[in-house]
Amino acid sequence: MATSERFLPWSRATVFKHSPALARLLEHSFQPGSPETALNCPTLTATHAALLECAPCKICQLVYSLASDPACEVAFFEDYACLCFYALYAPLCWTSTFMAAADFLELVSRYFPGAVGEGGLYGPEGIMAVDLQLHFLIKRCFRPVAASELLDVCNLHFLKSEFLKGALTGSVSNLFCFKSIWGSMHAPAVKQQAGGGGCGCCGLSSSLSAAAPADKRRAGGGGGAAETRRPEFAEAVSRAFPQGGGRAQTGVKPELLSVFLDVWGESDLLSEANREMAAAAPARAAGALGRFEFTYPETADRCQGPCMLSQALQLKKSNRTASICVLCECIAGHAEGAEALRLLKRDILTFVENNVKIPDRISFIVRQRDSLVYVRDPLLRGVIRGCSEQEIHKHLFCDPLCALNSASACPDILFGEPGEEELRILKSSLAIGNHLAENIFLDCEVLHTLVIIFKSIQLCKVGKTTFLEIIKELNHQLKNHNLQTLHTFHTATIYC
């Protein structure tokens, strides 16, 4: 039975309310500590099984069974749709998966407490991190799809699953030929773009902003030096989440970045400076928001941390960068994160007129005592300054996933505090399928698929021809969507 308290995703209070269950999910999100235990590791077995394209989606199965209950309240549909809406505007990163886990557990325990069971909702015998990722962030099962487009979408999802399996196991099948499969796909968006045309799916009228021109929406993704005003939401959304100046009007939710630091403090992910900041968390939390307590399992690979909640499924490091981007976590975990990084990128580009290398520009700016003065929260400022020059370079100028996250995420939605009436109207609209078909800032299933494939081939072995074909196609798509990054071959060879 529902409580009188309203459901609002991305809330810090939800994390602490369900901390024991989330700790269980984290415990089963580690790589095994030794090769001898890998074959019988329940986490790896369950994750690999979920990535099979013939495997059912555990979230879809559970939601369908709950929704089929005659006693199911209308409010459940509204709140579930609200969570899906937040996931649509969240970056693809560790924090987003973690928050989806917290919010989904809150929904199930609120409306169907008997469905949780004594063993909990999360674990090898139930729902795993990969199930949450696939449903809410990678395949987005909640999105409306026309019958004529379903097979095309399934083909793209197959490619995502195949390369994610490669990231998990370390290699993609020798029988797999990307060029042959990609070239034979009959998806209209693939064929149109392969022929030199624009992005068909991003040119469609959005359910959120039917009047927004395609070129304006693509420019809203940014990535270049020039700033373009983002498209506007439909009325029901804009009333709940006024963009820009609306933050002061509606308020802002507490940050989640400190929870990320709490969980990752013992791993090898954080830089020395950020590790010290994580170690100082108890002093900060004494009179503030509280600390998320979590103990790493003894038999797990503690160096990699709970990496299975990340799309990378492992923690790999190269040239002072990692397969899990701390700056993407800043976007998902702090209301100021996206704007702070946008302003930092502007400062880097305009720092000097000479042909100074970007990593040098970054180091000069970060060294200045008054750098990032526009960031009000010292925690966020400290985390950004604690990142290496290479991490900042990778996030702002190189990595296609970071560029995609920066273009499509919406802090106004994730961290806004909508009024009661505005939220009620929005949820009613979401429950009948409105506003879930497309992210109005940047939404292309072809590009999304290629980015996931690219991040996977950074972590697993593929043939030389396959590698180069993926690089070529991804560069073409990034250019089509006005996402200006360094050539992805450059990124793939030096960074994670």
Swiss-Prot record:
Protein's name in the database: Packaging protein UL32 homolog
Residues noted as binding Zn(2+) 2 in the record, renumbered to the chain: C325, C328, H395, C402
Gene Ontology annotations for the cellular component aspect, listed alphabetically: host cell cytoplasm; host cell nucleus; viral envelope
Family membership: Belongs to the herpesviridae UL32 protein family.
Keyword Zinc-finger: yes
Region (Zinc finger 1): 57-141
MF term (GO), any: zinc ion binding
Stretches for region Zinc finger 2: 325-402
Database matches in InterPro entries: Herpes_env
UniProt keyword list: Host cytoplasm, Host nucleus, Metal-binding, Zinc, Zinc-finger
Amino-acid positions noted as binding Zn(2+) 1 in the UniProt annotation, renumbered to this chain: C57, C60, H135, C141
Binding-site list for Zn(2+) 3: C201, C202, C444, H481
Sequence segments annotated as region (Zinc finger 3): 201-481
Keyword Zinc-finger: yes
Function summary: Plays a role in efficient localization of neo-synthesized capsids to nuclear replication compartments, thereby controlling cleavage and packaging of virus genomic DNA.
Gene: 68
Major subcellular location class: host cell
Pfam families per UniProt: Herpes_env
Classification via PROSITE patterns: HERPESVIRUS_UL32 (PS51988)
